[in-house]
Amino acid sequence: MNKTRISRVGEEIKKELSLVLQRGLKDPRVGFVTVTDVEVSSDLQLAKVFVSIFGSEEERKASLAGLTKAKGYLRTEIGKRVKLRHIPDFVFKLDESIDYGSKIESILREISTEGEKQDES
Protein backbone atom coordinates (compact mmCIF):
# COMPACT_ATOMS: atom_id res chain seq x y z
CA MET A 1 0.00 0.00 0.00
CA ASN A 2 1.08 3.59 -0.55
CA LYS A 3 3.34 4.80 2.29
CA THR A 4 1.89 8.29 2.09
CA ARG A 5 -1.62 6.97 2.70
CA ILE A 6 -0.46 4.81 5.60
CA SER A 7 1.25 7.83 7.12
CA ARG A 8 -1.87 9.99 6.70
CA VAL A 9 -4.08 7.31 8.26
CA GLY A 10 -1.67 7.09 11.21
CA GLU A 11 -1.70 10.86 11.71
CA GLU A 12 -5.50 10.99 11.51
CA ILE A 13 -5.85 8.18 14.05
CA LYS A 14 -3.34 9.95 16.32
CA LYS A 15 -5.30 13.21 16.16
CA GLU A 16 -8.70 11.63 16.78
CA LEU A 17 -7.44 9.26 19.47
CA SER A 18 -5.92 12.22 21.33
CA LEU A 19 -9.29 13.98 21.27
CA VAL A 20 -11.15 10.89 22.48
CA LEU A 21 -8.67 10.38 25.32
CA GLN A 22 -9.03 14.02 26.38
CA ARG A 23 -12.81 14.25 26.27
CA GLY A 24 -14.46 10.86 25.98
CA LEU A 25 -12.66 8.32 28.14
CA LYS A 26 -13.94 8.31 31.72
CA ASP A 27 -11.75 5.52 33.13
CA PRO A 28 -10.19 6.78 36.39
CA ARG A 29 -7.11 4.58 35.85
CA VAL A 30 -6.19 6.52 32.73
CA GLY A 31 -4.40 9.61 33.95
CA PHE A 32 -2.59 12.26 31.94
CA VAL A 33 -1.94 10.42 28.66
CA THR A 34 -0.45 11.91 25.50
CA VAL A 35 -0.42 10.07 22.17
CA THR A 36 3.07 10.64 20.78
CA ASP A 37 2.97 8.49 17.64
CA VAL A 38 0.89 5.93 15.76
CA GLU A 39 2.50 3.38 13.44
CA VAL A 40 0.01 1.65 11.16
CA SER A 41 0.87 -1.63 9.44
CA SER A 42 0.92 -1.74 5.64
CA ASP A 43 -2.37 -3.69 5.52
CA LEU A 44 -4.05 -1.24 7.99
CA GLN A 45 -4.93 -4.12 10.33
CA LEU A 46 -2.72 -3.10 13.27
CA ALA A 47 -1.79 0.24 14.80
CA LYS A 48 0.94 0.61 17.40
CA VAL A 49 -0.06 3.57 19.56
CA PHE A 50 2.85 5.10 21.46
CA VAL A 51 1.74 6.98 24.57
CA SER A 52 3.53 9.10 27.11
CA ILE A 53 2.03 8.85 30.58
CA PHE A 54 2.72 11.32 33.37
CA GLY A 55 3.11 9.82 36.83
CA SER A 56 4.89 7.12 38.79
CA GLU A 57 5.72 3.70 37.38
CA GLU A 58 2.67 2.25 39.13
CA GLU A 59 0.37 4.92 37.66
CA ARG A 60 1.83 4.30 34.20
CA LYS A 61 1.10 0.59 34.42
CA ALA A 62 -2.45 1.29 35.60
CA SER A 63 -3.02 3.78 32.78
CA LEU A 64 -1.65 1.35 30.20
CA ALA A 65 -3.94 -1.38 31.57
CA GLY A 66 -6.90 1.03 31.41
CA LEU A 67 -6.11 1.91 27.80
CA THR A 68 -5.85 -1.76 26.85
CA LYS A 69 -9.18 -2.44 28.58
CA ALA A 70 -10.83 0.46 26.71
CA LYS A 71 -9.51 -0.69 23.32
CA GLY A 72 -12.96 -1.69 22.03
CA TYR A 73 -14.53 1.63 23.01
CA LEU A 74 -11.64 3.55 21.45
CA ARG A 75 -11.90 1.60 18.18
CA THR A 76 -15.65 2.31 18.05
CA GLU A 77 -15.10 6.05 18.61
CA ILE A 78 -12.32 6.20 16.00
CA GLY A 79 -14.59 4.31 13.59
CA LYS A 80 -17.19 7.06 13.94
CA ARG A 81 -14.63 9.78 13.23
CA VAL A 82 -12.29 8.26 10.61
CA LYS A 83 -13.70 6.91 7.37
CA LEU A 84 -12.02 3.54 6.92
CA ARG A 85 -13.44 0.20 5.88
CA HIS A 86 -11.66 -1.49 8.78
CA ILE A 87 -10.38 0.23 11.92
CA PRO A 88 -6.99 -1.21 12.92
CA ASP A 89 -6.53 -3.07 16.17
CA PHE A 90 -4.67 -0.92 18.72
CA VAL A 91 -1.57 -2.05 20.58
CA PHE A 92 -0.59 0.47 23.25
CA LYS A 93 3.12 0.92 23.94
CA LEU A 94 4.77 3.19 26.47
CA ASP A 95 6.92 5.87 24.79
CA GLU A 96 9.90 6.50 27.02
CA SER A 97 11.64 8.95 24.69
CA ILE A 98 10.33 11.98 26.60
CA ASP A 99 11.68 10.60 29.90
CA TYR A 100 14.97 9.77 28.21
CA GLY A 101 15.20 13.32 26.82
CA SER A 102 14.50 14.78 30.27
CA LYS A 103 17.28 12.67 31.81
CA ILE A 104 19.75 13.80 29.13
CA GLU A 105 18.73 17.42 29.64
CA SER A 106 19.25 17.21 33.41
CA ILE A 107 22.67 15.59 32.92
CA LEU A 108 23.69 18.35 30.50
CA ARG A 109 22.50 20.99 32.98
CA GLU A 110 24.50 19.33 35.73
CA ILE A 111 27.63 19.24 33.56
CA SER A 112 27.12 22.89 32.66
CA THR A 113 26.85 23.99 36.30
CA GLU A 114 29.93 21.94 37.22
CA GLY A 115 31.84 23.63 34.39
CA GLU A 116 30.79 27.07 35.62
CA LYS A 117 31.91 26.22 39.17
CA GLN A 118 35.33 25.12 37.89
CA ASP A 119 35.69 28.32 35.85
CA GLU A 120 35.00 30.40 38.97
CA SER A 121 37.70 28.57 40.98
Curated annotation (Swiss-Prot):
InterPro entries: KH_dom-like_a/b, RbfA, RbfA_dom_sf, Ribosome-bd_factorA_CS. It comes from the Bacteria. Gene3D superfamilies: 3.30.300.20. Keywords: Cytoplasm, Ribosome biogenesis. GO terms for molecular function: ribosomal small subunit binding. It is found in: Cytoplasm. GO terms for cellular component: cytosol. PROSITE patterns: RBFA. GO terms for biological process: maturation of SSU-rRNA. One of several proteins that assist in the late maturation steps of the functional core of the 30S ribosomal subunit. Associates with free 30S ribosomal subunits (but not with 30S subunits that are part of 70S ribosomes or polysomes). Required for efficient processing of 16S rRNA. May interact with the 5'-terminal helix region of 16S rRNA. Monomer. Binds 30S ribosomal subunits, but not 50S ribosomal subunits or 70S ribosomes. HAMAP family: RbfA. Belongs to the RbfA family. This is Ribosome-binding factor A. The gene is rbfA.
